[in-house]
Amino acid sequence: MGKLFGTDGIRGIVGEDLTHELALKVGEAAAYVLGSKSKKELTVLIGRDTRISGQMLASALSAGLMSQGAKVIDLGVVPTPAVSYLVEKYDASMGVMISASHNPSEYNGIKLFNHEGFKLPDATENEIEKYLLGKAVPTTTKVGTYEVCDTAIDDYVNHIVDTSKDINKKLKIVVDCAYGSASATAPILFDKLGMDVVVMNYEYDGYNINDKAGSTHLEGLVKQVKKLKADVGIAYDGDADRCLMVDENGVLVDGDQIMAISSLDLKESGDLRNNTLVGTVMSNLGLVKFCEQNDIHFEATKVGDRYVLEKMIECDYIIGGEQSGHVIFKDFANTGDGELTSVQILNILSKKGVKMSELASIMKTYPQVLINVKVREEAKGQYENDSQVTKAIQSVEKELKGEGRVLIRPSGTEALIRVMIEGLDQEDIDKKAKQIADVIEKKFGV
């Protein structure tokens, strides 16, 4: 068995990579590892998205936790950032979110948070993994307890509402819940904000999460925004830790643009701590140039919101995120939060009194292409030293003449190598990306 924890916890197809036996072991091992570091009773919050497998995995995980004497509090269907927020609010020892984010319903995952609502550090995950891969967890005669929490949604939603600032209630908004976690919270949130909102894709059945809906499938949202002549469209992913938007014309406003809008607003109000925005190596070149033009320091990390957050904590920065819509507003949250992000943008939209398209136009997005090449798992550690791949990359970089960039990186959760190119012309970079992808596929493809 390979390494279980990826960049975003454990994830896989239910019944194959992720079984109830594994969930039981995760609960058992996590309770033992974290319990041995704490003198007080271990209290663990468990949330889940809307997948049919969520309840089964939550039950198995709960059994493992309780077998080590932990007190389990079931939050039910909530967004991932709700677990992160409530761990600290409820003074719990640990939080667990059962979700596979933007993946289809046959996938699920287990994400662990510490007592402050931060994702567990790699060292702690590695310690837990030793027990999952064979090391026996010491047994105990102490048995834990289980209870259902009926205040989680209200407590989380009220927290988001508290970050709103004079939002224009005349704004017409369409919200896509992706048949996921936001279905349980977004309608309540916008009702409390007193907004004119049309909510779509909220009637989940356990199988339709992310199915032609949400931040990975914006077509339906675009259609509704145009049809209803709405001011803005908002799309969440399956566990609502990311948010993408579309303007009044149905044009995408991605995570990079959201960060540009937010960081400039913070700078203008004197609140951009240490004058820095944190992105990743995958952030659009347009965001980097936007920061240069507006005298904002841009800090790039490895891909993954956990690495963005680590840099933010290390250097006391307050905003960071990814193009995919994972945006962290550190003054309010310890992880990416889709609903929080959407409220911050609505705050700015209301304050400026302009159309969403004008707000988003402050950043020029460079044409970008991303090709995912399916490869053998072991290839993710071999391609960098391959002479043919290196030659293909260098050839394309030379042709770009400094007006673009090439980035090749392995996926943290799947057997993929991602080929990303940015440049001035879409057709040109599409061809260049395919050249590199073809070389990788020929050498390392499945």
Language model features with spans:
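Gly/Ser/Thr-enriched, mixed-charge loops and adjacent short helices
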Residues: 13, 108-228
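Glycine-rich phosphate-binding loop
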Residues: 92-101, 107, 225-247, 252, ...
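An N-terminal, well-structured beta->alpha segment
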Residues: 1-63, 67-68, 145-173, 380-381
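N-terminal small/polar loop signature for handling phosphorylated ligands or for N-terminal nucleophile
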Residues: 32, 36, 43-108, 188-246
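Proline/glycine-rich low-complexity loops and linkers
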Residues: 126-157, 162, 248-320, 328
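Short glycine-rich phosphate-binding loop at a beta-alpha junction
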Residues: 40-49, 73, 172-174, 275-281, ...
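Phosphate-binding and adjacent anionic-ligand microenvironments
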Residues: 269-446
